[in-house]
Amino acid sequence: MAKTLSKSSGGALAPWLGISLIVILFDQLTKIAVLKTFAYGAMHALTPFFNLTLIYNRGAAFGFLATAGGWQRWAFTALGIGATLVICYLLKRHGHQRLFSLSLALILGGALGNVIDRLIYGHVIDFLDFHVGAWHWPAFNLADSAITVGAVLLIYDELRRVRGAR
């Protein structure tokens, strides 16, 4: 008979880590392809509003602290590793909560994808460039997308939980 998970027992960590691993693999494979295909700073238009490019981000989201002098590489790496530990703890404890755990798995995969870049290259590889006319959204990557989707799902899950408690 299959063992069922109760709210008090937490849940299996492996499925959620598997999702994180898939995010990391897709993120790293796309970055490798972009590094091998594009010159730094070149833009390749795919649609009137979307380009592929190769940008190095030494800061955080939207280039925050990109010119800070190098310390940010290690600070953001440490932050990513710290987030990994907290997320793994939460996944182990709340693995039975599917939407919550999915959101954390996506955030974990994205965070580790960018940590890998910082450790290997000293910066994060960004390549997705959306724009309207001459205005460009800051370039980003699949890891950033996974973090964003995970954060949106986390907010949705919390709103759903709070509304259900009323």
Swiss-Prot record:
Location of the active site: 126, 144
PROSITE patterns: SPASE_II
GO CC, one annotated term: plasma membrane
Pathway the protein acts in: Protein modification; lipoprotein biosynthesis (signal peptide cleavage)
Topology of the protein relative to the lipid bilayer: Multi-pass membrane protein
Any single GO BP term: proteolysis
Transmembrane segments annotated in the record for this chain: 10-30, 32-52, 71-91, 100-120, 135-155
Protein name: Lipoprotein signal peptidase
Organism the protein comes from: Burkholderia mallei (strain ATCC 23344)
